[in-house]
């Protein structure tokens, strides 16, 4: 077994055209963790049919920041689909916050949602339900199978690009026009 390991933590996974899994088709995933034991990420470009008001009502949280009322909640992936995750800038952290980089953190607490609802949250954030997960070697096999393009994450794409434009914006980070790629794969 090869002892060399490259972590793709703080990278985007961009689904390839032939990937027809309904959970991951036409998605951009931000990888929060990637070790030899597996990987965990959040789909960033799939708004759900739930907005912040509905989530806050369900959790008994009062919203004091009017701009949040229609803030979409995103489908972060098929794993733990009922659990909330918040990708956010590191200007605000909580006791259970996982610092991914110096600029990006991941939180999953009611306290974080309450602070956001009060208008005391981080400068930029994305709230999701669920995440994506891979067992040891699974993500590497999918990348070797050409299911994913991988590039370093871009904060502007992550937090400031509308979800319907994130797929194209992420591919531009790589300098690729996905409309020119064939859905067929091969290794020659």
From Swiss-Prot:
One cellular component (GO) term of this entry: cytosol
Pfam family, one: DUF179
Cystine connections: none
Top-level lineage group: Bacteria
Family statement: Belongs to the UPF0301 (AlgH) family.
NCBIfam families given in the database record: PRK00228.1-1
Matches recorded under PANTHER family: UNCHARACTERIZED PROTEIN YQGE, UPF0301 PROTEIN YQGE
Protein name as it appears in the record: UPF0301 protein Mmwyl1_0539
Originating species: Marinomonas sp. (strain MWYL1)
